[in-house]
Structures are given as C-alpha cells and as structure tokens.
A protein has these predicted regions:
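An N-terminal assembly and electron-transfer interface module characteristic of large anaerobic redox
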Residues: 1-307
Length: 307
C-alpha cells in the first residue's frame, strides 16, 4: 500500500511517500534528510556553524520589566538584523529599553503579513519582514525600531565597497508605507537611515535621533553606542574563533567540512530550508564564510565587486 504523510522534523515539512510491502517492510521517499526515515540522526557531534551563529547573534537576555525604565522596543528578526542584532540588543539595554525580538521565522510568520506585501517579485526574506512586524504589532509593542542601513562596516582593507543590497538598505521604508496596522495601532515606527561605516559615524547619528525622538542626553546615547560597538566586535570575534575551532576539529578527526556561503540572513532555518542540517547529516561540518574569511589573504585586484 502507498500512503502520503508530512515530516515534522524541521521547517521543510517534506511530503513523504510511504510504500509498505508484505512482511512489514517499507520504503520512504520524498525526504531530504534522515529525519523523515524515523532514524535517529547520526553524528550529532558534527559542527554546524549556521545553527551556532544563529544562537550567538540572537540569544540576548532582555531587561526585566521592572528595570526597563524607558519601556519596550520591538525589533523584527529580519534582513540587516542578522548582521547587527548584537549591537541593537546591547544599545537598547544600556538605554533602559526592554527588547522584544520577533520569533524565529516560519510559514506562520509569513502568513501574518502576506496581505501587506506590495509585490510578488520580492525575495522571500523581504516578504517575511511583514509577518515579523505584524507579530510585534499584535503584541501591543508601542515602539518598533527597524533602521535603514545603506552601508555596513568594511570587512577587509582594500574592499571595493561595503553597501547593502537595495532591499536590505531600505525595506523598512516599504514596511512604513504598506502596513496600515502601524498607524491604526498608533505604533511609533522609527526607521532612520544610518551607517555602520565607523563607530563614530553611527554613534553621532544615534545621538541625534534619540535626542530628537526621546530627549535622551547625547552623552548617555554615546556611552550606550560605545558598549554596543564593542559587543558587535566581540560577536564577530567569537564567530572567527569558532571557525578556527571547527578547522582544528577537522584536522584532529580527519573529517571534512563545507563553507556554506550566503547572505547573513541565510542562517534563518525558514530561509535556508535546512540545507546545513542536511549537510551535517552526511558527516560534513558546516562553516559560515565569516568564520574563516579572516584566515585567508585576497589577491587583488579582483574582477568582481568585493564588499
């Protein structure tokens, strides 16, 4: 007999075809990894830096309600936050805001904002942003912070540029102009244009914005920005150290690894469709490009834009 089922082992929800034969034997197809087979996943000790980095970036303890003297700020777990959340988590905590981060992406999150997506041609990571904002609004968050970031830090000296793609740069403008919920619920939606070009430039921009919007003394904002910049640097250092640990693990064990390159938000399980888990299920370690890029030397000039 043949029956259909759906695996619930990960966000892929693979459709399984189960063929049962006489004698109790069965053959399962449609699965992308071993989970759908009902077999205990082998080699759980294989490093997966997609998963490790995801938790390093987002596992920050927010202030308790009694210590949040300036209230709650909602931050969507989207796009540029996969590069800079350590900064914002620290910055707002230092200023006395309790950070409410939207949950891990899922199809349910996507469906929350589907009616406000202005174009089907947008990439899926951008479409998810609508759902994350909607989730925050439904939690009665009075203030949402989602800045426009045209420029990130320059990764290496000599890089051709350090700008974000247009969607990452200004998608919060799209949100502001297409989500009527923000106005209906009287949510303060703050999306200033800022740049991570340098610590000084970003700090100055933040001092101006938070003086204007919340009357926070510039000296206080400057101090918070300093701690936030240091935490962002520490997060990046931790990723590099973890990459070195995995390389040493590969040398010690004789195993193989794969550098799974992509944009920062590709560590989102809903976006990467579990490809990192699939790779580790075959016994390969998974490294992110930023966990090992500091170990190499780029021969210049390049024939592509390096940023």
């Amino acid at each position: 007999t043949t029956t259909m089922s759906r695996c619930r082992g990960c966000v892929n929800h693979c459709v399984l075809t189960i063929n049962r034969f006489e004698g109790g034997r069965q053959y399962i197809s449609g699965n992308r990894c071993e989970r759908g087979l009902g077999v205990e996943k082998a080699k759980r000790d294989i490093p997966n830096l997609f998963t490790w980095k995801y938790h390093r970036l987002f596992d920050y303890e927010p202030l308790t309600a009694d210590k949040a003297t300036r209230g709650v700020v909602g931050i969507p777990r989207v796009l540029n936050m996969y590069e800079n959340f350590p900064y914002w988590a620290t910055f707002f905590k230092e200023l006395g805001f309790r950070v409410m981060l939207s949950p891990q992406s899922s199809h349910q999150i996507y469906e929350l904002g589907i009616e406000t997506i202005p174009s089907e041609s947008e990439c899926y990571p951008a479409k998810l942003a609508h759902g994350h904002i909607s989730w925050l609004i439904k939690r009665d968050v009075p203030f949402i912070f989602y800045p426009c970031i045209p420029y990130e830090r320059k990764e290496v000296p000599g890089a051709g540029n350090h700008y974000n793609c247009p969607m990452v740069t200004s998608y919060s403008e799209n949100i502001k102009n297409n989500m009527e919920e923000l106005k209906e619920k009287d949510v303060k939606f703050l999306n200033p244009f800022m740049a991570f070009t340098s610590e000084e430039i970003l700090s100055k921009q933040l001092q101006e914005v938070f003086k204007k919007e919340f009357d926070i003394p510039e000296s206080e904002t400057k101090k918070a920005a300093k701690k936030a910049w240091n935490e962002l640097a520490q997060a990046r250092t931790d990723v590099e150290k973890k990459g070195e640990e995995v390389l040493q693990y590969l040398k010690d064990t004789g195993k193989h690894g794969i550098v799974l390159a992509g944009r920062p938000y590709h560590i989102d399980p809903e976006i990467n469709h579990g490809i990192a888990d699939m790779i580790t299920s075959y016994g390969f370690a998974v490294l992110t490009e930023d966990s090992v890029s500091h170990l190499g030397k780029v021969e210049r000039p390049l024939v592509v834009t390096d940023q």
